[in-house]
């Protein structure tokens, strides 16, 4: 990988956030054998209950490999980042490179799981952003103080811990999602040396034949999660129930082909579905008004659509930082300096599209089903339709929804 990175520098296709990569690797190396990676692996050895002698032997071998291979690999990354000529690092989007737009089109299809053109997706994003903004304005017009409470983070949930959120969600979704039986899981913090302020939580995809508890890792850094915030509740729903953990459990139970469960990877579907559920789950909150829930849902969708449009703008239409600043200003999200936001999107083309374009596909399928079926529409049956095939391209999901509509008429 490092040789490839150096080759990119030579031929002019290097596109990295060099400083962030270097700083993260330095943090990992600094922890040395106290790394949470090694700690976690040692815990896995303990859980095997191999006896004192074998446990001691394997831990010693693991520590040796960690010191001889793992840490030096991170040191090599740091060394390479220092050697790179920052003047040869591209600071604009892919469209400024030879064949860059064509490459972005391929990345776009891979990330979104849809065969729709970029122009068609832009229309969908613009349409949804407008409808979300209108919904926000409708809420604010009725309750002007609510928006102030929202932007100042004063709208809180009752929760003090993640476990209580998942326990309640597991109970609350029973009428709206098909059963997957009892979910055995645990929630563990991400080690501080590996944690990043940009990652609030993640779900570890379990082995097909695994029997250990499913695992959600949460970021305990102060700038990552506030336990009582609406965003944290949504994050837990996204990673846990009815999001990734639930969706994987459903697929493992109902999609009998192990190859599909292990090899099929359609991030547009999996992240789009989880984004849909994080917003849907807000309806279950006690002590948070319906208007506050509606405001949160539509503000998130509005901002997500703008992020997706900005990604397209930077990498497909050649936006500069000034272009991005003007776009955000025109849409009510002006900031004094867009550099960090621009650099994040520029260094990671299509990284957010799986979430946001994927969500739009599911939301539009639901809207179509609701308009077609009217009072015959049922959330549980719709959810079963979009879960039916496991991770799949959206043309398959669309066919499942069409079948649901026909059967429900």
Regions found by a protein language model. Give the residues of each.
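N-terminal maturation segment of proteins
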Residues: 1-409
């Amino acid at each position: 990988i490092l040789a490839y990175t150096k080759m990119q520098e030579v031929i002019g296709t290097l596109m990295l956030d060099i400083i962030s990569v270097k700083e993260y690797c330095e943090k990992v190396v600094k922890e040395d054998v106290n790394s949470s990676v090694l700690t976690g692996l040692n815990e896995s050895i303990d859980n095997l209950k191999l006896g004192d002698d074998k446990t001691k032997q394997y831990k010693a071998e693991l520590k040796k490999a960690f010191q001889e291979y793992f840490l030096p690999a991170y040191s090599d990354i740091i060394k390479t980042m220092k050697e790179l000529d920052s003047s040869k690092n591209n600071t604009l989007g892919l469209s400024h490179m030879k064949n860059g737009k064509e490459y972005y089109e391929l990345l776009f299809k891979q990330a979104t799981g849809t065969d729709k053109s970029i122009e068609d997706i832009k229309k969908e994003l613009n349409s949804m952003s407008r409808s979300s903004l209108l919904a926000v304005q409708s809420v604010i017009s009725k309750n002007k103080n609510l928006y102030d409470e929202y932007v100042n983070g004063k709208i809180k949930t009752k929760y003090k811990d993640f476990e209580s959120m998942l326990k309640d969600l597991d109970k609350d979704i029973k009428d709206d999602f098909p059963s997957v039986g009892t979910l055995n899981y645990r929630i563990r913090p991400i080690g501080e040396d590996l944690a990043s302020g940009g990652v609030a939580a993640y779900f570890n995809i379990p082995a097909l034949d695994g029997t250990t508890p499913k695992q959600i890792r949460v970021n305990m850094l102060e700038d990552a999660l506030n336990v009582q915030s609406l965003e944290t509740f949504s994050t837990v729903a996204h990673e846990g129930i009815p999001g990734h953990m639930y969706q994987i459990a459903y697929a493992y139970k109902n999609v009998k082909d192990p190859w599909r469960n292990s090899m099929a990877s359609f991030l547009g579907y999996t992240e789009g579905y989880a984004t849909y559920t994080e917003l849907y789950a807000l309806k279950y909150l006690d002590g948070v008004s319906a208007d506050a829930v509606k405001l949160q849902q539509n503000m998130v969708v509005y901002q997500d659509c703008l992020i997706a449009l900005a990604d397209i703008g930077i990498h497909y239409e050649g936006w500069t930082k000034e272009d991005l600043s003007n776009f955000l200003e025109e849409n009510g999200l002006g900031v004094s300096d867009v550099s960090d936001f621009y650099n994040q999107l520029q260094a990671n083309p299509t990284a957010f599209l799986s979430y946001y374009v994927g969500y739009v596909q599911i939301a539009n399928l639901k809207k179509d089903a609701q308009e077609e079926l009217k009072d015959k529409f049922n959330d549980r049956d719709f959810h079963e339709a979009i879960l039916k095939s496991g991770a799949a391209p959206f043309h398959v999901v669309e066919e499942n929804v069409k079948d649901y509509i026909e059967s429900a008429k």
